[in-house]
Amino acid sequence: MGTSAIKYFDLKQFRTTGYRFDFKKMLDDKGNTAVYLFYSYVRICSIYRKLNLSQSDIDELVKTKKIEIKEKAEKNLVNHLLLFNDVIDEVLKDLALNLLCDYVYGIATKFSEFYEACKIQGNDSRILITELCKRFMKLSFDLLSLTPIEKI
């Protein structure tokens, strides 16, 4: 996690701006840090373990169920997830990986709001939204060359 924390702290800065190297800020578990992002990712993995859901169970839900958005937190999260292609276009146009960092941080914060506001257990639609978050976070981590963890 340490290497990813340093790498993320560097990538979240706009490429032409300087910053002060600060381990304390890099390893903070609050705010726009790799530790916070990994905590959100671990939370998703933990939800699946708690609900006894295997990846094949989730894949079956993806094939057979639909997402129904009823709550504001669900809408905010899904709308943010849908920005992915636009964010990637901007990253490529401006050579600004910090925009992808902001995007994945947005997923983490909006997922936290969703988790607090919406009961996931027993709701296939919310499990699917959770899976979307996991997949977009994993894809973002891969693009940023960060190695996520599934347990803390």
Ranges and model annotations:
Residues 2-152:
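Non-catalytic interaction-recognition regions
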